[in-house]
């Protein structure tokens, strides 16, 4: 088949025009798609509420929770546990000391009762002798003996009260320090000593 020169030239000239038309149509389609795509983005939902992002949000939530849990278990909780354990040991030691002081007080009471019994026995013997020496002299000796007994009784009571007060004061101070430390470790706040003291006193009064 023979192709004339004029036909070949016409075909060559028409090919670029056809190509240009195809490119123009493609650009038009791309432009329309881009407009539609932008319109779709403009009317989209808020990203945190977009269901396509749920997986990544759950993943980051799990990672954040895991890091927070590690921080609590490795840093915060061991420190709080150490403080509580130290305070617990100190309270146990102070309670043991308070028990010893109470034992000393009981021993002092027993000694006082023994001395009182001896004094009463002596007073009885003095009274018996007074019947022979005279009523006046017996009354004087009895008054002297009773004064000595009263003095010893008062001294013993003051000693017992001081021992008990010291023991309760030590326990109260330890409770206040422990409460203030726990508040500082858990809440990161500096506890008011007056408020802590009032709270501890209120608890002790309710348990009394």
From Swiss-Prot:
Cellular component terms per the entry's GO annotation: plasma membrane; proton-transporting ATP synthase complex
Source superkingdom: Bacteria
Signal peptide: none
Membrane topology, from the record: Single-pass membrane protein
The protein's role, per its UniProt record: F(1)F(0) ATP synthase produces ATP from ADP in the presence of a proton or sodium gradient. F-type ATPases consist of two structural domains, F(1) containing the extramembraneous catalytic core and F(0) containing the membrane proton channel, linked together by a central stalk and a peripheral stalk. During catalysis, ATP synthesis in the catalytic domain of F(1) is coupled via a rotary mechanism of the central stalk subunits to proton translocation. Component of the F(0) channel, it forms part of the peripheral stalk, linking F(1) to F(0).
Family: Belongs to the ATPase B chain family.
Name under which the protein is recorded: ATP synthase subunit b 1
Origin species: Brucella canis (strain ATCC 23365 / NCTC 10854 / RM-666)
